[in-house]
């Protein structure tokens, strides 16, 4: 898929909770096709000391408006500066980057699991897969109610569940502690997950033991986005691979994780 450098217009900057923001960017020309799980590298112009672009996951797209949204979590100086941008400002991007999720077949029952800011690609995936809402189960986890990211778009899916570590929203615990996960995992044909490493490894372990198809979106540190700097390399069954170009989505059978 061809990568392009685009100067985009910021049309919306919405704070979703204390450290997560949704930025909506619009292009003057038609955007290239984007796949759930891909990301965008953004230049932080207002901070001259920040040399490298920052990668952000695509939350959703609106081809009719030539726009898409990014989830920006404040993790450092670059992301913090980006959240101060105002609608009307222009942002330099490189897009789309990486390999996204494999689309399910029409008969598949799928489980989408997002932890923390890993919820970013899940709504996009749920919408793009084109399945009946009854075939889609969404399970989102966070530390507390205040850490959960806006879930309005998920309401169309009947099987939509929360977990929080302090029981302030949904069931208490991690996503792997949820009653649906523990009792109905084997009913799904495909599992897709994005979130903290320990969460994804736990999901991968359970999917492996159940013999289920499972893809995870890794969150390795990235710099260039083109597989040149090698800072995001992940060991796989077929050698080292750059997460920014050969991921960030991998089938769990490609990874060398030990359960």
Residue ranges and their predicted role:
Residues 1-4, 240-259:
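Short, basic/aromatic-enriched C-terminal tail that caps enzymatic domains
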